[in-house]
UniProtKB/Swiss-Prot annotation:
Pfam family, one: SDH_C
Active site: K71 (proton acceptor)
Protein EC: 1.1.1.25
HAMAP family, A to Z: Shikimate_DH_AroE (MF_00222)
Binding site for shikimate: S20, I21, S22, S67, N92, D107, Y229
Cross-referenced PANTHER family: BIFUNCTIONAL 3-DEHYDROQUINATE DEHYDRATASE_SHIKIMATE DEHYDROGENASE, CHLOROPLASTIC (PTHR21089:SF1), SHIKIMATE DEHYDROGENASE (PTHR21089)
Reactions that this protein is recorded to catalyse: shikimate + NADP(+) = 3-dehydroshikimate + NADPH + H(+)
Family membership noted in the UniProt record: Belongs to the shikimate dehydrogenase family.
Keywords assigned by UniProt, alphabetized: Amino-acid biosynthesis, Aromatic amino acid biosynthesis, NADP, Oxidoreductase
Binding-site residues, NADP(+): G129, A130, G131, G132, A133, V227, G250
Protein name per UniProt: Shikimate dehydrogenase (NADP(+))
Organism encoding this protein: Streptococcus sanguinis (strain SK36)
Length: 284
C-alpha cells in the first residue's frame, strides 16, 4: 500500500472497534483494485460522534462504516438517507457525495448476497430475533418482494417488535407476521412453510447457546443461515447440518456488506472472492 498526498481515507466508527476485521477487508480491497485509499478503525466517544462525521467532509474522505452503538445516533448528522436506511432506521455506511453525506444500510444486501444461489423474491423466510442485523435482513427481504416473513421474538419484546414490523410492512406492502419464540409449535409450523431460516440473534457466539429448541425438525429444502461468524460453526449451524440441510455462517454477510460499501465509495467492485479466501483461512 502506497500512501501519498492523494490518498483518501475511509474508516469504521464505533466503540469498541479495535477488534474489527473491516480494516483488513477494505485495505486488501484498496490494494487489489489500485484505489489510492486507506481504511482505519476509529474508536469514538459518543460526545465526539458529530465532529467525527463532520471530518468526512473536512478531509474529503470516501466515507465511514458505523457499528454499535452509533448506527442510529449518526442519522441527525447526515444530509440524506437511502431508502433502506430510512426503512431500517439505522445506518452502517456513510458516503461522501461531493460534500453531501448520504446514509445507507448495506447489511441486508450483504446478507442476501452471501447466500449461495438463493433469491428471496416470492419465497418465505423465518427469522429469529428482531435486533439491528435481523431488522436489516427483514427490511431487505421486504424490499426484494419476499412472499411472507415470519419474525420470532421474545415475549417481553413482542409489542415493540409488532409496531416496528408494522411500519416496515406498511411501507413495503409486504406480509410480515410477528410471533413469540416461546411458542415452539408455531415456530415448527412456520419453519415447515419456509424456504429460509435465519438466526438473527447473538445466541451461539459463546459456542454453546441455541436460539431455538433442538427437537425442532427442518424440511429438506430449507436453507439455514446465521449472522454470527465467530465461531465459524455455531451450535445452530451444526444442528442444521446434522439434519442434512445447507447452512451458511455470517462471514459472507460481513464481507458482502463491506463490498456494497466499497463500491458506493469507489465505484469499483470489491474483489470479494480473493478476500473471501483470506477470511476463510483466518476464521476456519
Amino acid at each position: 500500500m502506497r500512501i501519498n498526498g492523494h490518498t483518501r481515507m475511509a474508516a469504521v466508527v464505533a466503540k469498541p472497534i479495535k477488534h474489527s476485521i473491516s480494516p483488513l477487508i477494505h485495505n486488501m480491497a484498496f490494494e487489489k483494485t489500485g484505489v489510492n485509499g486507506v481504511y482505519l478503525a476509529w474508536e469514538v466517544e459518543a460526545k465526539d460522534l458529530q465532529a467525527s462525521i463532520e471530518n468526512i467532509r473536512r478531509y474529503d474522505m470516501f466515507g465511514v462504516n458505523l457499528s454499535m452503538p452509533y448506527k442510529q445516533e449518526v442519522i441527525p448528522y447526515l444530509d440524506e438517507l437511502d431508502v433502506s436506511a430510512r426503512l431500517i432506521g439505522a445506518v452502517n455506511t456513510v458516503v461522501n457525495k461531493n460534500g453531501i453525506l448520504v446514509g445507507y444500510n448495506t447489511d441486508g444486501k450483504g446478507f442476501f448476497k452471501s447466500l449461495p444461489s438463493f433469491a428471496i423474491r416470492g419465497k418465505k423466510m423465518t427469522i429469529l430475533g428482531a435486533g439491528g442485523a435481523a431488522t436489516a435482513i427483514i427490511a431487505q427481504a421486504a424490499l426484494y418482494n419476499a412472499e411472507e416473513i415470519f419474525v420470532f421474538t421474545r415475549q417481553a419484546s413482542y409489542e415493540k417488535i409488532v409496531s416496528k414490523m408494522a411500519a416496515i410492512s406498511h411501507q413495503t406492502k409486504s406480509r410480515i407476521q410477528v410471533l413469540t419464540l416461546e411458542d415452539a409449535d408455531s415456530l415448527q409450523d412456520k419453519i415447515n412453510q419456509s424456504d429460509l431460516l435465519v438466526n438473527g440473534t447473538s445466541l451461539g457466539m459463546d459456542g454453546v447457546s441455541m436460539p431455538l429448541p433442538e427437537q425442532l425438525e427442518l424440511p429438506s429444502q430449507i436453507l439455514v443461515a446465521d449472522v454470527i461468524y465467530q465461531p465459524f460453526e455455531t451450535p445452530f449451524l451444526k444442528w442444521a447440518r446434522n439434519q442434512n440441510v445447507t447452512a451458511v455462517n455470517g462471514l459472507g454477510m460481513l464481507l458482502y456488506q463491506g463490498a456494497e460499501a466499497f463500491e458506493l465509495w469507489t465505484g469499483k467492485p470489491m474483489p470479494s472472492q480473493e478476500i473471501w479466501q483470506c477470511l476463510e483461512e483466518l476464521y476456519k
